UniProtKB/Swiss-Prot annotation:
It holds the Pfam family AAA_5. Induction: Under denitrifying conditions. InterPro entries: ATPase_dyneun-rel_AAA, CbbQ/NirQ/NorQ/GpvN, CbbQ_C, P-loop_NTPase. This is Denitrification regulatory protein NirQ. The keyword Transcription regulation applies. It comes from Stutzerimonas stutzeri. The keyword Cytoplasm applies. Gene3D superfamilies: P-loop containing nucleotide triphosphate hydrolases (3.40.50.300). The lineage of its organism: Bacteria, Pseudomonadati, Pseudomonadota, Gammaproteobacteria, Pseudomonadales.
Amino acid sequence: MRYLPVNAIEIPTTAGTPDAPFYQPLGNEEQLFQQAWQHGMPVLIKGPTGCGKTRFVQHMAHRLNLPLYTVACHDDLSAADLVGRHLIGAQGTWWQDGPLTRAVREGGICYLDEVVEARQDTAVVLHPLADDRRELFIERTGEALKAPPGFMLVVSYNPGYQNLLKGMKPSTRQRFVAMRFDYPPTAEEERIVANEAQVDAALAAQVVKLGQALRRLEQHDLEEVASTRLLIFTARMIRSGMTPRQACLACLAEPLSDDPQTVAALMDVVYVHFG
């Protein structure tokens, strides 16, 4: 392991080691994330489903040698779920830290996936952490935790899912350094599929070409297009011995739509590429 000194903060660089999560850089996102961490700035990642947002955060946590606490946000996720709560047991009552509090105490990364799904009261907790104060107030214990230099708050969401009822308020969004992700260009996506699915370049190219054809059908009754994740699933199934048509039905057509006619239309595209 080697260390790169950055303004008195040492960054342990572990990228490329056998257990490093694979990530294919597409631009300057690694440098931007690293500089944001160096300056104590939170990061907002927005992009469609399955484009690599979570894998990127895992990759950067490994690269920076930081503990990573990932929270999959949902409608019932409250501030108490993030901060912690009192529990009652045989030995009495005790306080249990939530994932956000643990990340602050340990100086790690707290990653809130699909943050707009969480309840509105979470913003009250996140705002002091996401501005110059970098503080977490635990109302139930009276603690005010000052985030150490290593702590970083990272959130993500899919802009395509936003509506009038669920969206990130400008007062929250403007506290973050924002990064926009999308599906990779052809050559990079082929490398990703080949690496993740452990298939040869020819099959990866064929699957990616199919995925791009399906993405052009976005306006045809599809809520979401074929993600890189689904292309990887498809390639893995084909590698394991499933026929291409069966793999594409199970890993692409059916996950993309519940409507039988739409599924049939998607399979027509599959037949063109895997006749």
